[in-house]
């Protein structure tokens, strides 16, 4: 009697059930990517322009986030934010109900803060890779520093950073499986892998 290595009927039957969790996975990844792009851009600018206090805070933020595992950050978000909000309620007399906050919000916070730290380094490296003479040339023809940055430097930096953003998005899709630890059932959680 010959045994079958893979049960293809079971795989086909299960595929539809697993795909039902795909919107949650994509939702986490896309929302995280959008907000991370925005936050990481400002973190990168703060570090490049060496704004006194803000630059130091951005450096500490990037170092801390990149030095701790995402799983720890999810737990800190999931257990820490409610504690902070309860403390703020008691301290300032607010009436915020922490129990009404959906769990996915804590996942978004952890993922956005994590991805922003990594993507800020991508932004920073991409901006610094554009030669300074291009900024100087733009300023010499009458552009302000912000105009030169917006019209000359950032478009080139974005092209340089785009492959890294793609890699970050792929990694983010994989990382969404960690949301299962706080009971968000996404693609891998649904598959029980």
Give the predicted meaning of each segment.
Residues 1-193:
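Transmembrane alpha-helices and adjacent helix-loop boundaries
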